[in-house]
Every structure is written in structure tokens, then in C-alpha cells.
Amino acid sequence: MDQSTKQTRQQSLPRHVTKTHFVFGPNIRPAMSASRSETIRLDTQDCYQGLITEDPATHLQIQEAKQIPVTGPVYVEGADIGDVLCVHIQNINLSTTGVFAIRPQTGIIGQDIRDQVVKVLPIKSNGLMLNKSISVPLQPVVGVIGVAPKHGEIET
């Protein structure tokens, strides 16, 4: 592949952001600037901030996070305070594993849970694999998305 083809291909790939933080606020330095029509990629983290690995014992070492990590911020060129922004989610690429964690007194059935259970399960094209023959279809969600307030900070 010649140099001009490489440059064209690199220019056509969306720029991406990996920086995370835990508040929306006007004083957080943007991770990137983007035009209104530009396609960008955001590499996000789960609510455990990517700290739970294939070893379920790692969950026992993690204190429940008070905040959810958000990726960015992205400064949208030409956007003014008070503008409504429309974001199109083109695709959600999933990790190769998902975490299933329950513990006593947490969640809707927490009062019925006696022991903490953590499972790190594989994600395949047909869903979350509970075992070799049973998979649960997935419905990916975006999570937290928002804009900075004019004054103050909002925790995630």
C-alpha cells in the first residue's frame, strides 16, 4: 500500500477518545474537539471501570463505585450554551466478557440474596453464554451521556 493510500485510510477512520472522568462540568478540559457532522469513536468503561477481570475474585476487592465513568468530554465546534445536540449512536461494540454480580442488600431482589455471587461470562455473537448450551440475547445500552452545565458540576 502506498503512502497516499495509507494517509487516506487513516483520515477516513474516526478519531477516538479514551479519557474518562466522573462529572459533567464546564471546567473539564475537552479530550477532543469535533465538528457537528464528524464521526468519532468513544471507548467506554463498564461501571466497574474495567477492574474486574476474568478472575471473579477481583470483584471482592472492589468497593462499589459511587460514580459511573464517562468518556470525553468532546467539544462540539459551533455548539453554544443552551443548544440541543443530537447524537447518533452508529454502533456498540461489546467486550468479549460480561460481569454478572449480585450481593446481599443490593438491587431489586437484594433482600433475598444471602451470598455474593460473581460470574465473568463470555459474550458471543448470539448473546451472553450462561453455559455451553444456554445463551441470553443481549440488548446493549449506551449508559450515561450528557452535556456540561453552564455552572457547577453534576456527578455521574
What would you call each of these model-derived segments?
Residues D2-S4, T8-I62:
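N-terminal, Lys/Arg-enriched amphipathic/low-complexity engagement segments
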Residues N27-R29, V70-P73:
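Short, solvent-exposed loop/turn positions at domain surfaces
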Residues S35, E77-D80:
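Residue-level recognition of short, solvent-exposed, well-ordered loop/turn junctions
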Residues L42, V84-V87:
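A generic structural signal for residues embedded in beta-strands
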